[in-house]
C-alpha cells in the first residue's frame, strides 16, 4: 500500500512592512515549515532619513528639534544624549537644578515609553482593553510636558547645552506629585488585571527565551538584557546626571522570556515613580515660585540662592558655539536600552562625525535567532516584547 508523502516544501511569507502588528515599517521575510518558523530575515531601512548626516550639517541648537522624531515614543532621551555629547566634549557644567529637571523629564518619558509598549504588546497577544487604559495615563504625562515645554509628544525642544530651555512653570511640581499619587495605584490595577492572568501567562511564558550569555554576546541592553538576569543599568553604572542622589533599585528577572520582559518594564515604571517623587522633593530651590520668592527676599546677590546650582542653565550657548577638537562616546539608559552618541569635533559649529547608537536596532538583531523553532502565531508576541520603533532603528 502506497504511503502519502506528508513532507512539504518550505513556504516564504512576507510580514509587513504594512502589517498592523509590525510597530512601524518593518518587513520580516519568514520561512515556514507548516506552522514552524525555520528562518526569519528582517528587512529594515524603510524609514531611513539620514539623521546622522543632518546632524553633521546643523549646529547643536538647530539639531535638537530633529531628534525626537527618531524614537517618537521617547524623544526626551534623544534630546538628552544629543546635548550631553558636546557638553562633555567641551567640559560645560550643568547646574544641579537643571540636572534634576532633566531627570524628571527623562523618567516621565520612561513611564510613557513603557506604557506605549504595554498597550500594543497586550493587543498583539489578544487583550484589547489595556490598550485604552494606557492612553489615559499617557495623557497626564502629555499635560505635564505641555505645561513645561509647550509640546506634548514630540518636538519638545527642551534640552540645551548646559541645562534646559526654561525653568519649570508655577505649580508644575505639585501637579507632578499628583500624577505620581494617581498613577501608582494604576500600576497595581495593571498587575491585578494582567500579571497573574492565567490566559496571559500561558500565552507568553517560555516564548522568545534569551539566555544570559546570549544577551551579553548579542549586545542587548535595557529590559531585554535585565530580563535575562543581567543587572546592568547605565543610571547606576555611569551615574550620569544626578541619579546617585536617589534611592532606587534595578529591575531584573532571570527567565529571559517575554513574560520576564513584561515584569521588568512594569517594575521599572514603579522605580521611575519613586525617582520622580524624590526629585520633586529634593530639587535645589524647590518649586519655581518658592525659588523666585527667596530671591526677591534676599538683597545679597552673592547668596547661594543665586548660585549656579539653582539655575536652570549654566550659560545660554550662542548659536555659533563651536564643538572642540576631539572625539567622545557618551551614552544613557533610555526606556529601550543604551542609546549613545559618538561625536568628533574639529572646532567648527557643526560636528565632523555624529554617530548614533540606537538601542532597539541592537535589540532587534537577535529576533531571527529567537524566532527559529517558534510557531507563526508567536512571531508578533516575540517581536512585541522587544519594543522597537522603526524611526529609531532606521534613522
UniProtKB/Swiss-Prot annotation:
GO terms for cellular component: plasma membrane-derived thylakoid membrane. NDH-1 can be composed of about 15 different subunits; different subcomplexes with different compositions have been identified which probably have different functions. PROSITE patterns: COMPLEX1_49K. NDH-1 shuttles electrons from an unknown electron donor, via FMN and iron-sulfur (Fe-S) centers, to quinones in the respiratory and/or the photosynthetic chain. The immediate electron acceptor for the enzyme in this species is believed to be plastoquinone. Couples the redox reaction to proton translocation, and thus conserves the redox energy in a proton gradient. Cyanobacterial NDH-1 also plays a role in inorganic carbon-concentration. Pfam families: Complex1_49kDa (PF00346). It is an enzyme of class 7 (translocase). HAMAP family: NDH1_NuoD. It is found in: Cellular thylakoid membrane. The lineage of its organism: Bacteria, Bacillati, Cyanobacteriota, Cyanophyceae, Synechococcales. It catalyses: a plastoquinone + NADH + (n+1) H(+)(in) = a plastoquinol + NAD(+) + n H(+)(out); a plastoquinone + NADPH + (n+1) H(+)(in) = a plastoquinol + NADP(+) + n H(+)(out). The gene is ndhH. One of its GO terms (biological process) is photosynthesis, light reaction. The keyword NADP applies. GO terms for molecular function: NAD binding; oxidoreductase activity, acting on NAD(P)H, quinone or similar compound as acceptor; quinone binding. Keywords: Membrane, NAD, NADP, Plastoquinone, Quinone, Thylakoid, Translocase, Transport. This is NAD(P)H-quinone oxidoreductase subunit H. Belongs to the complex I 49 kDa subunit family. Its EC number is 7.1.1.-. Its main location: membrane. SUPFAM superfamilies: HydB/Nqo4-like. It comes from the Bacteria. NCBIfam families: PRK06075.1, PRK07415.1.
